[in-house]
Each structure stands twice: as C-alpha cells, then as structure tokens.
Amino acid sequence: MKALIDAGVVKFGRFVLSSGIESPFYVDLRRALGHPDLVKWVVSGYLSALSRLKFDVLLGVATGGIPYASILGYLLQKPFGYVRAGAKGYGTMQAVEGADVAGLAAVVVDDVLTTGNSLINAIKAVREAGGEVVGALVFLDREQCGSQNVRRETGVEVFSVYKMRELLETLKPYIGEGHYRAAVEYLAKWSC
C-alpha cells in the first residue's frame, strides 16, 4: 500500500476537486498506470467486485475509467467502450463509443467517486444509447454522498473496491497521524 503514496496515487495537502470541493487529500488513479504492479493490484480489485454482477459490456467513464474498463473487458473477453463527458459535435455525434450498447446489460466503470455527477451523466448517456445499466463500479468511493446521489438520480447501485475510510486505515502507517486525522475529520462532515 505504501506504493500508492510513492507513486503519487494518493496525496495529502490542499486540493480542489473537479466538483469544486476543497479536500485535504487527492486520489489520482491515473498515476497507477505508470506502475504495472499497481495496475495489476487495481485490476484485481475491480475483477473481484465485478464478480457480483451479470453484464454484457463494460463502459469506462472519460477519462479515469477508460483504461480500467479496457483492461477489464480484454481480460474478461467482454465488449468494452467508453462514455464521453458529452456527445461529440461532429462525425457520429455519439456520447458512447466502442461497443454498441443497444439492448445490452452494461456496467459503467470509473476510477474515483465523489459527488456522482460523472456517473449520473454516463448512465443517462448509456440509457439514451439503448443500453441497460445494471451497475456502476468505482475503485474508490470517497464517501462524499456520490453513491447515494447516483442511486437517487438513476436507480443504479454503485459498487466500490474501496471506501475512503478503509483506504485511510490501510495507509495510516505511511501517511502520519496529522494527515490521517485531517482526512477522517473532513469525511466526518459528510452526512448522506
């Protein structure tokens, strides 16, 4: 687990998230891509969580979910593709690329879940393309009401490999008491 810190996947300090929320920690799973041993560990976690779901196609959420959905699709020999943040304004003008999802049971894959907005938009895009979303899978749920927001807005259950508090417990020996306490206190402010 120390490798997550060493590779810069998990950082502590002051960060502004894509949602505009300020946070004392940042998790960037894209950084794992430069470390094959970490990719193997991340993919193993995703595979374990996916074993609970029956699906036909995997779709990564742009951009963090794309590499992992691709690897998972390849390993499981399932069709895969990705969901753009918005439909292209040219060519086919599609939001869902890669596999044709019409009539298929899809799992939407992302790296980190905060508010749930990216997943909500991706689920809506898959449905508009004729797919049935049977679940959403993230590596890390930051426990900031994202899974509840997704369920409330779309009816789709979010599965995660890790919850942030679990990850913090595991990382505690490597991050120091100050960072650990700041992160736990920050998470305690979120009531869903």
UniProtKB/Swiss-Prot annotation:
InterPro entries to which the protein is assigned, alphabetical: OPRT (IPR023031), Or_phspho_trans_dom (IPR004467), PRibTrfase_dom (IPR000836), PRTase-like (IPR029057)
Cofactor(s) in the UniProt record: Mg(2+)
CDD domains: PRTases_typeI
Pfam families per the UniProt record, alphabetical: Pribosyltran
Record SUPFAM superfamilies: PRTase-like
Reactions it catalyzes: orotidine 5'-phosphate + diphosphate = orotate + 5-phospho-alpha-D-ribose 1-diphosphate
Keyword hit for Magnesium: yes
Molecular functions (GO terms): magnesium ion binding; orotate phosphoribosyltransferase activity
Enzyme Commission number(s) of this protein: 2.4.2.10
Keyword Glycosyltransferase: yes
Keyword terms: Glycosyltransferase, Magnesium, Pyrimidine biosynthesis, Transferase
Superkingdom of this protein's organism: Archaea
UniProt record, GO biological process: 'de novo' UMP biosynthetic process; pyrimidine nucleobase biosynthetic process
Binding site for orotate: T114, R142
Residues annotated for 5-phospho-alpha-D-ribose 1-diphosphate binding in this entry: R84, K88, D110, D111, V112, L113, T114, T115, G116, N117, S118
Gene3D superfamilies attached to this UniProt entry: 3.40.50.2020
Pathway: Pyrimidine metabolism; UMP biosynthesis via de novo pathway; UMP from orotate: step 1/2
Function: Catalyzes the transfer of a ribosyl phosphate group from 5-phosphoribose 1-diphosphate to orotate, leading to the formation of orotidine monophosphate (OMP).
Family indicated by similarity: Belongs to the purine/pyrimidine phosphoribosyltransferase family. PyrE subfamily.
Quaternary context: Homodimer.
Name used for this protein in its record: Orotate phosphoribosyltransferase
Species whose genome carries this gene: Pyrobaculum calidifontis (strain DSM 21063 / JCM 11548 / VA1)
